[in-house]
Amino acid sequence: LDLYGTIRAAVPTFDTYSHIGPQENFEKAIRKAAYFMERGGVFIFDLNTPYKHRHILAGQTFDIEAEDADCHWSNRYDETAQRVDITINIDYHETGEHFHEAFSEYSYALDTVCALLEKYGFAVAKVADGESFGPVRGDSPRWIITAVKQYTQEEKANGTES
C-alpha cells in the first residue's frame, strides 16, 4: 500500500485482512494503513476468527450442484501456521470450462490484532460480531473491528502525538 496523500478512512471488506499472512505481513498491512491515516481517521475491517477456521472450515468439504455449474470447495487447517488452505474448483456445464483457485486465510487472536493496531497509533473503538453486529461471542465466525487513528505520522516523528 503506497498512496500519494493521506486518508481519512479505510474499509477493506470481504475478508481482505484474513488473506494477509503470515503475521509479519499482517502487521505490515496495519502499519501501512496507519502510515497514511490522518488523526481521527477510521479503520474498519472484517476478519475471520480462529474459531471459524478451527471449527467451521477445518477439514470441511462443500459440494454444491447448481443448474449451470458444480462447485467443490475444500478446506485444510494447519494449526502450526494458524492457516486454512482453501481450494475451489468450479465446472461449468454448458461451456465445459473449469475454474480452479487455491488460497489461504490466516487466524489471529483478537488480543494480537488489538495490540498491533495500538502499536501503530490506533485506538480500538469497537469489536463486533461480524454476523449479528452485536457483542463478540466465543463462537463468532467473524469480527468487525473499528479503530481510530490517534496521531499523524508527522506528529509521531516530531514527538507531539498525544
What are these model-derived regions, one by one?
Residues D2-A10:
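A short acidic, Gly/Pro-enriched loop at the edge of an enzyme's catalytic core
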Residues I7, Q82-V84, G138-W143:
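A short, glycine/Asx- and small/polar-enriched loop/turn
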Residues A10-V11, Q60-I64, W143-I144:
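Short, hinge-like loop/turn segments at secondary-structure boundaries
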Residues S18-I20:
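A short His-aromatic
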Residues E24, I44-L116:
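SAM-dependent methyltransferase
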Residues E27-R39:
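A short glycine-rich, Lys/Arg-flanked "PGG" loop and its adjoining helix->strand segment in the class I
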